[in-house]
Amino acid sequence: GGSAFVNILIGMIRTKFVAVLLGPTGVGLQNMYTTIMQTISTITSLGLNSSGVRSIAEANGQNDSERVARIVKTIRSTIWISGIVGTIITIILSGYISEFTFNTQEHKLPIIFLSVIVLLTNIQVGQTCILQGLRKIADIAKISIWGAVNGTLISIPCFYFWGQDGIVPSLILTAIAALFTSWTYAKKISIIKTDLPNEIRKKELSNLLSFGLPQMGTAFISTASAYL
């Protein structure tokens, strides 16, 4: 509750500054870039942010530390691969995305630069879902607050000095800050060392995807509706 209030307060302050510094056109452009990256990240996350929490919480509730370790390893390796693939696909399709969204190729280069956010977001979501699965509620709240603070402290100077040209750097730097924060807290988690043969990895990944992909589909429809 407290973290939600802080986030809302900081969000109101950021929104006010952004509106003044960027104007309606700049705010609209920032929102479109954000929505594009969110839509792609939703697909490339494969729903692991939902299924990962469920599987880790289940294994942790059974005090099965070895399975928790296997699931965590599977999630971490998968989000790296899917994030890299998503980034590459975004770069390849950047021209089409720009044309479809803005009816022009002018935004192709910014979308190429922003494609790294897909990877950064994937990794950050993976770390956060591990914390959620292990019920690190206090850490999640701190990550949320730091995310709002960092986003504000990064975006306002970018917009003040560069105007609309600061949108792309601010989004990338905010994603880096969010990843750094989540990684800082995720590193504190004690996970036992365990081998992860390919057979077991495939089994765990199959379990994660069987629940995650339908969740991803639902989330994609919600995100894509805002994009369209």
Segments the model singles out, each with a brief description of its role:
Residues 1-6, 111-117, 130-156, 168, ...:
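Alpha-helical transmembrane segments of multi-pass membrane transporters/permeases
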Residues 16, 46-62, 133, 191-194:
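Helix-loop junctions and terminal segments of transmembrane helices
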Residues 36-41, 77-81, 108-113, 135-139, ...:
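Short alpha-helical transmembrane interface motifs in multi-pass membrane proteins
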Residues 19, 98, 132, 158-159:
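Helix-capping/transition residues at the boundaries of transmembrane alpha-helices
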Residues 182-227:
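Interhelical loop/hinge segments that connect adjacent transmembrane helices in multipass membrane
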Residues 1-54, 87-91, 117, 148-152, ...:
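Signature of the first transmembrane helix
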Residues 88, 92, 103-127, 141-145, ...:
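Alpha-helical transmembrane segments of multi-pass membrane proteins
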Residues 24-30, 62-74, 84-115, 160-169:
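Membrane-interface helix-capping segments at transmembrane helix termini in multi-pass transporters
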